[in-house]
Amino acid sequence: RPLNLLISGASGVLGAALKPLLTTGGHQVWTLVRRRPDRSRGEIHWNPERDELNLAGLPPFDGVIHLAGDNIGEGRWTDAKKRRVIDSRVLGTGLLARTLAALPVRPAVLLSASAVGFYGNCLDCCMREEDPAGGDFISDVCSLWEHAATPAADAGIRTVFLRIGVVLSPRGGALQRLLATRA
């Protein structure tokens, strides 16, 4: 049956590939945007920095795919950049998790992005999902990021963390930059 889905980060490399795949599969896909939304395109405004997200009046979501977060591969890792990386993940995830938990009809699942960096920098280790977080900046970010989804899990929403590695696509991310150097 067609599903009613909500996606954050739909303009990123993964979201931009996922949304058309889901819509051509017959699913209704709503997207969270920070700019002025176009409701005819299924867009919903949100602003994690201001704790703004209103899902009232929308049909219940079967699932939510949360991919939003500042691109860690762009720019120098200044203190301000690190703060953006943390806030874009923790504030957005927390807002989304709290909002979903408060809905009268909650989604069955929240798929929330995280990163393989959760485990830290261990080049000669084979990691398992249940292994603890590492002890570096990215590990700390991932731990905070995943913890921010607690309200959704506590409300009975199945919460799954997608510990994503380097995204390889000619449409963006690391591979696009590598391919550009060959041109």
Predicted features and spans:
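Catalytic helix-loop patch of NAD(P)-dependent Rossmann-fold dehydrogenases
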Residues: D87, L123-F161
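NAD(P)-dependent short-chain dehydrogenase/reductase
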Residues: A153-A155, V160-F161, G165-A183
